[in-house]
Amino acid sequence: MKKFKLNSPYKPLGDQPKAINSLVDGINKGEKEQTLLGVTGSGKTFTMANVIEKVQKPTLVISHNKTLAAQLYEEFKEFFPDNAVEYFVSYYDYYQPEAYVPRTDTFIDKESSVNEEIDIMRHSATQSLLSRDDVIVVSSVSCIYGIGSPEDYGEFAFGIAVGDNYDRSDIIRKLVFMQYERNDIEFARGHFRVRGDVIEINPVHGTPPVRVELFGDEIDAISLIDKVTGKKTESLKRYMIFPAKHFVVGQDKMDTAIRNISDELDERLNEFNLSNKLLEAQRLEQRTRFDIEMLQEMGYCPGVENYSMHLSGRKWGEKPYSLLKYFPEDYLTIIDESHVTLPQIRGMYNGDRARKETLVEHGFRLPSAKENRPLRFDEFESSINQIIYVSATPGAYELSRSSNIVEQIIRPTGLVDPEVIIRPVKGQVEDLLGEVKKRAKKDERVLVTTLTKKMAEDLTDYYAKIGVKVRYMHSEIDTLERIDIVDDLRRGTFDVLVGVNLLREGLDLPEVSLVAILDADKEGFLRNETSLIQTIGRAARNINGQVIMYVDEMTDSVKNATAITSKRRKIQIKYNEKHGIVPKTTKRALKDKKVAEDLDIEGTDISKIPKDELRLLISDLENDMKEAAAKLDFERAASLRDQIATLKGLKKDSS
């Protein structure tokens, strides 16, 4: 029986069947690296889902940010409802790593806010990988950062079954070693409680708590229970308990690690003292001795990851454990938007290293803290088995290494690439104004990209003064406001959106029929071939899609982007004519705006809310926030969190 079973009412269309067969054939032949060059809107995710079903391999999908990873996670969950589709991103809502600024003698301590829902999902991902083989993990570049050894993590996991011989104290001891906290009052995630011969455990991976009933030294019953009422919801014959944290170490390993940490500390203190760096020596000794004491007493300490080299028994320079190590040997990796994701993976190590060097140099951390790090790019390369790079504009790295480059140019919708028109820079503002008016009459929208923030502001002000309904998008606008701006553009609240880097906004909007690129011949990051092709793709969701590039000189980037788009457009039109396909603009439903669902604090005089109602309101918003996080709607969850903080501040002031 197949492990992976794709569930979709759609069949592969356009170039999808050819792409699926070619990629599957490559994987079956043992090809290590392949590229799917798929235009915007060609259904690359659906192609990937079909490939996974056909090759039947556990799969890691890497995206370059949390939001896109969440979208992919939701899509794969719909495609594979009967399989383990997991989500693995950084669990920090807010993260300020520890750092030291020598110029001002300022130490910035680590400050973070952990999203509990995401932590649950991270544990769910690692547990699925160690317990089943039908797993798809959608991840950000967090997957290359260090976590505990899968051998230690799996070794500490233990299964129980009705009829097994277990002493009560043995189970309690195992739970403590696995970093579960005994708390007979607060039954939170990662806690357990004991009542006579009954042990109740609240696991970290989000499943309901489990009750283990003993009769003497024998397990008499195992059942899932309701966390609030304690009522039994399901009887079980067996149950697997996994560690509460990814960094778990056995006592023998811990003793060895503590000895090695102490030896390294003595060596480093000697270096500082010989160099007359007495302040650094005192600072390092005080912090490290405290951490050693915590490790001896609790098996854990704040910032335990900085001792990961010693705790996992690694040597200097040895590859750290990451999520990739939890996968079996024969797995598939898919890099989404590879032209952005790969440079991000490549850059993680150097940024982390530079910050740690300063901390080590000034006595805030032992040198081995530098080994708590993301994978270097060469280590990432050696960790992958078979890989598919996915992008509309793959980079030179992917193309040079891929033994098979598969093009997916024909869209299932029949939509063709937009027509690209070249016009002179002189008079571009007035020329564009005429085009904007034409689109506004047809209830269509326009995206305009400028070279600088000042140009975008000036253009927006000028158009607004002469009656154009226009808005400006810039990097300082927060996520929630950005979502509102895009929503208002789609609804027709305004007709023109101006910005500098509209690529990163993910603006694939069916209402947009014109993309205007001002000063397109000014070579640079946002006017190179890749960026131009990506920007052109913003007009590919509308049947009337056009792109106007204003240039004085036909640069290589402009020539190549125009030629590639023109070639694809001809192929698409020819295919449609041959098969009698009539293109239609993509349909995407607009979500109803939540008018009263969230509390609009700015528009409400919250000082007049009675105390009792305020308490209830905070409670309701907290429930909504948890629900939003569970649905991966992190923007809404963050908004609710901020509203709760405001209300709690008011409550504190009035009490």
UniProtKB/Swiss-Prot annotation:
Main localization, broad class: cytoplasm
Short sequence motif Beta-hairpin: positions: 91-114
Gene Ontology MF annotations: ATP binding; ATP hydrolysis activity; DNA binding; excinuclease ABC activity; helicase activity
Superkingdom of the source species: Archaea
Localization of this protein: Cytoplasm
Domain UVR: 615-650
Keywords: ATP-binding, Cytoplasm, DNA damage, DNA excision, DNA repair, Excision nuclease, Helicase, Hydrolase, Nucleotide-binding, SOS response
Helicase C-terminal domain residues: 428-590
Keyword Glycoprotein: no
Positions that bind ATP: 38-45
Record domain Helicase ATP-binding: where: 25-181
UniProt key word Disulfide bond: no
GO annotation terms (biological process): nucleotide-excision repair; SOS response
Complexes and interactors: Forms a heterotetramer with UvrA during the search for lesions. Interacts with UvrC in an incision complex.
Similarity comment: Belongs to the UvrB family.
Function: The UvrABC repair system catalyzes the recognition and processing of DNA lesions. A damage recognition complex composed of 2 UvrA and 2 UvrB subunits scans DNA for abnormalities. Upon binding of the UvrA(2)B(2) complex to a putative damaged site, the DNA wraps around one UvrB monomer. DNA wrap is dependent on ATP binding by UvrB and probably causes local melting of the DNA helix, facilitating insertion of UvrB beta-hairpin between the DNA strands. Then UvrB probes one DNA strand for the presence of a lesion.
NCBIfam families, alphabetized: PRK05298.1, uvrb
HAMAP family reported in the protein's UniProt record: UvrB (MF_00204)
Protein name: UvrABC system protein B
The organism of origin for this protein: Methanobrevibacter smithii (strain ATCC 35061 / DSM 861 / OCM 144 / PS)
